[in-house]
């Protein structure tokens, strides 16, 4: 997709973090955004800039994989998504922004996943803007924001 939009790109095996770090330094990357990146960054502190991730649950609840299924199996009334900073702990970094999604009685894993993805599309740009503004002012107030999806 990057080529389609004229964005410089290169494929690097996910296990070669040293090469990724090197490229991000050369390209002077300001922010790394993980969306659908189902890998663990082993040493996030070695990267030259912040890394944020969008995760399909309301962290700190349901870290890791299969989180939509786990929320449904637990009988939760709502779930959602979280954008957070990546640190050494899996899905354990500081929360930037969360969006809540109700779990409806007739929801399936597929329908709930789609509802969460719609919320992710809404909060990820806002989270990126928040990180950008925080870095420009050299001040992070640790505010947690939440959005709510309607039942429509």
Regions found by a protein language model. Give the residues of each.
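One-carbon transfer enzymes
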Residues: 1-152
